[in-house]
Amino acid sequence: MAAVVGVSLKRGFSATALGRVGLQFQACREAQTAAAAAPRIKTFAIYRWDPDKAGDKPRMQTYKVDLNKCGPMVLDALIKIKNEIDSTLTFRRSCREGICGSCAMNINGGNTLACTRRIDTDLGKVSKIYPLPHMYVIKDLVPDLSNFYAQYKSIEPYLKKKDESQEGKQQYLQSIEDREKLDGLYECILCACCSTSCPSYWWNGDKYLGPAVLMQAYRWMIDSRDEFTEERLAKLQDPFSLYRCHTIMNCTQTCPKGLNPGKAIAEIKKMMATYKEKRALA
């Protein structure tokens, strides 16, 4: 310290001036510490409903969280609320990295993943959280995805070969170019954000397969290793499974992975036109 003071004095600074600088620096640090310690209270309004409670009706319940003591994502706030404020709050979550799709929900009016959606730091705004829309609710933020998964199963989302004699004995290879055709399709995590944002799916969810399932159907239709493309197309010929899509494009807008289900559906429609022409000429 003496050496520093000596250098400072040689440059024209007095010991008194140096002392003032030190005091100002200390005051600045104390002010920063005080500012950081000031609570930043954020209000969350969360949909609650417990079917096991007699007479319980859906309602919005508010919780207050100090953002200084919480992670940056909405899922961090939900976990903090469950762990420290209300253990009865129920929601799905797993990977916390936008990979599994478990924590899909409606946050401030848009379907997204709670683990990748940052908390709105405007303390004057209430963050509203609902389960995925137009789905039966099991409890709180947990939607019933039974119909969604049944529809996914119906498209047989796996590689199908007409000659299965070599199954398990050799690899089914494909070119780099054919593999690249699957980009933007295989990344789907089946979170159902797109399907539950689609008005056509709201109206005809029992018959219309929805954007998530149709995009996966297209993924297998264009896989060069699959040999059941025509059979897959034949399953979609009825008026509802495919053709309830009216290109509203909510699906593409809301996809948390940045995929384009609307485009995939349009490609299936083009394939269907060719398929029907081929059948008419047969």
UniProtKB/Swiss-Prot annotation:
Q: Quick check: keyword Transit peptide in the entry? A: yes
Q: Region Interaction with SDHAF1: which residues?
A: 148-220
Where does the chain bind [4Fe-4S] cluster?
188, 191, 194, 255
Q: Which InterPro entries match?
A: 2Fe-2S_ferredoxin-like_sf, 2Fe-2S_ferredoxin-type, 2Fe2S_fd_BS, 4Fe4S_Fe-S-bd, 4Fe4S_Fe_S_CS, Beta-grasp_dom_sf, Helical_ferredxn, SDH/FRD_Iron-Sulfur
**Which pathway is this protein engaged in?**
Carbohydrate metabolism; tricarboxylic acid cycle; fumarate from succinate (eukaryal route): step 1/1
Q: Give the transit peptide, as a residue range.
A: 1-30
Q: Which residues carry this modification: N6-acetyllysine?
A: 53, 57
State the oligomer form and interacting partners.
Component of complex II composed of four subunits: the flavoprotein (FP) SDHA, iron-sulfur protein (IP) SDHB, and a cytochrome b560 composed of SDHC and SDHD. Interacts with SDHAF1; the interaction is required for iron-sulfur cluster incorporation into SDHB.
Q: What is this protein called?
A: Succinate dehydrogenase [ubiquinone] iron-sulfur subunit, mitochondrial
